[in-house]
Every structure is written in C-alpha cells, then in structure tokens.
Amino acid sequence: MKGISVLGATGSIGTQTLDVLANHRDKFRLVAMSVGKNLTLAEEQIHQFKPPLVSVMTDEDRKTLASKVPEGTRVVCGEEGLIEVATAEKAEILVNAVIGSVGLAPTLAAIEAKKTIALANKETLVTAGHLVTEKAREHGVKLLPVDSEHSAIFQALQGERMDRLHRIIITASGGSFRDKSRDELNGVTVEDALKHPNWSMGAKITIDSATMMNKGLEVIEAHWLFNLPYEKIDVLLHKESIIHSMVEFVDRSVIAQLGTPDMRVPIQYALSYPDRLEFHEGQQLNLWEVGKLHFAPLDMERFRCMAFAYESGKQGGTMPTVLNAANEEAVELFLNNQLSFLGIEDVIEKALERHERIDSPSLADILHVDQETRAFVHSLIK
C-alpha cells in the first residue's frame, strides 16, 4: 500500500485526489495533508481518511481544527507545516496540488526526502524549473505530471526514444471566452469568466483558462518536464477537450491520448504509475456520441498571455517568475473586481517590461523577485 501526502487537499485537485484514494483504499493510504481556508471540508476529510498529520495556514486555524479532529491526528501550521507534510516519513508520493508559488519550498524539501512528486502545481516548475529538475536528477526522484495535458504526453512517450520525437502538441479548450472577440472581452464579468465549458476547476485556474495563461504556464512546465526546446512545443485549440495532447515523432506518426474530461483519471495514473488501476466512476468515451472533433490554430494576438508565456520561457532566468507572480496577483485583483479582464494582460506586460532578468537565479533570488513583482502589481492599482 502506497502512503500518499497531499498539499492542497481541500482544493479542486486535492478533493479529486481524495476521491481516487477513497476508490482504492486497498492501494493507497493518506498519511498527511495540508488544507486551505475551508476548515469545514478539512474536518470532514480528516474524519473520513484519518491522516496522522494535517497542516493549516495559520496558528489560529491550527487551534480551531485541533479541537475537532480524532485522536491520532496532529495539526501543524504555516510553511513549516507544509514542509512537514511534504516530507512525511510514511509517504511514498507527494501530490502537490496547492495553487501558486507556495508549493515550491515543500516540493524541493520532498525531493530531498526522495519522495516521488505528482505535480499539479504548475507554478513550481514555471518559477524554478531549473532548480526542481536539477534536484530531482540529483536525488533520483521522479516528477510525474498530474495535469491532463502533461499526463497525456507522458503516456504517449512511454517506451519511446526522446531523440525520435519531433514535437509535442498541447491541446487547449480556449476557456470560457473562446468564441468572443477582443472587443467583446472588454466588459466581461467575474461570473462570466468562471463558467468553464468542459472542466471542473478552481477559480484561479478557470480564469487562467479564460486568458489562456493556464496554457502558457503548461508550455513552460512541458519545457522542464520533458526537457524540450520551446520550438518543439505547439498549442492547438480543441474545444471538446477529448484529445488531451499529442506527440509527433520524426516519422510523422502522431500518438494522441483521448478520454472524457475528468481530472481523476490523470491523478490516478500518477498515483498508480507504472501500473493502471480500474476507474469505477465517470463516463466512458463514446466517440460516436461526440460525433465531431474541432481544431483551430492558436492566435497569439487574440490570446496575448500565450505570447507572454512563450517569450518569458525562451528568455528564461527570472522572467517566468515575474510572469507567474504578476498573473497570480492580477487574477486575484480581477476576482475581487479591482481589475478588468483585459487589465490582467496589461498588468503582466508592464511587470515583464520593467524587470531586469537574472539569468541563473538562486532560490533566494526567485523568492525576492516573486515578492517584488507582487508589490509592483499592487502599486499599479493604488
């Protein structure tokens, strides 16, 4: 039985991870988890799975939850708590499902503790891909993708030689506003943006899908996960989200991974790898019911965040850190009705333009640039 630690258990990926664990209690055991602000859900999860270790955000939350959990569950808090969860002794796999750059330090700690990393936190590789991949190689640690697109590529590459790969093709639904012109985007609301056509996701990633920044971050993540130059990473609009991604080889053969849009499938594959387990829930893919699959090229002028991501990734150094930090803050401002939807792009562009890149940043450099960028974004709103 594999011991599993989950960072971000009360979030969208976290709750779906616990669904997988509940469906395979003979294969997996939850040994540690961190939670966000939803302490009511956290309490339910703790009583259901009885993890020995739980981390919360603040000491006040720790005191609140500690009085409600069963005997045998220890509650810790803060960044130290996240790291304790990430490095829990009985965990074989860490599922990093927290949102944002807060997932970086726990991931590095888990790698040093030689845990297999199931990575749903894009920002870890976006902001510090060179540090994470280098440390993973140094400690012989596997980085297993949880994103459906990267999982699709990972599966398509099984048994293949990387020097025979021509390119990867990441598919994108286009998000909530895929059929709107840029003029129509001027007045869209938070409520409009949170209606994703295909996937069930958290608020931040749903907005990132609408701006296409989510796909931009996935491009940078793929660069690090598969050690590919950006010239070999393409993005294709595919509104049904049935083909999760494709790999083209030098002989022009293309292998695609298909399935109904259900995040629990790639989560389960990351946990069971290299094995496959039965998936008892969800819909079976019936292509005759789907009828048609649609594809369209990506318009970088229409989706400016994609252009920012490719450019930042190619420049490297601290540019992706700025991209990510500026985006996180801009999305939060939009969700709080302090910034327009198209204002998200403008803020990111200003942050990138002013930044003086550090070519080979240390962890301290990355954290400093991250905080400095966030402060700059807020200075634009005041």
UniProtKB/Swiss-Prot annotation:
Disulfide topology: none
Catalytic activity, EC: 1.1.1.267
One MF annotation (Gene Ontology) recorded for this entry: NADPH binding
Functional pathway: Isoprenoid biosynthesis; isopentenyl diphosphate biosynthesis via DXP pathway; isopentenyl diphosphate from 1-deoxy-D-xylulose 5-phosphate: step 1/6
Catalyses which reaction(s): 2-C-methyl-D-erythritol 4-phosphate + NADP(+) = 1-deoxy-D-xylulose 5-phosphate + NADPH + H(+)
GO biological process terms, semicolon-separated: isopentenyl diphosphate biosynthetic process, methylerythritol 4-phosphate pathway involved in terpenoid biosynthetic process
InterPro entries, alphabetized: DXP_reductoisomerase (IPR003821), DXP_reductoisomerase_C (IPR013644), DXP_reductoisomerase_N (IPR013512), DXPR_C (IPR026877), DXPR_C_sf (IPR036169), NAD(P)-bd_dom_sf (IPR036291)
Superkingdom of the organism of origin: Bacteria
Record: residues binding Mn(2+): 147, 149, 218
Binding site for 1-deoxy-D-xylulose 5-phosphate: 122, 148-149, 173, 196, 209, 214-215, 218
Keywords for this protein: Isoprene biosynthesis, Manganese, Metal-binding, NADP, Oxidoreductase
Names of required cofactors: Mg(2+); Mn(2+)
Binding site for NADPH: 10-13, 36-38, 121, 123, 202
Record function comment: Catalyzes the NADPH-dependent rearrangement and reduction of 1-deoxy-D-xylulose-5-phosphate (DXP) to 2-C-methyl-D-erythritol 4-phosphate (MEP).
Family per record: Belongs to the DXR family.
Protein's name in the database: 1-deoxy-D-xylulose 5-phosphate reductoisomerase
Gene: dxr
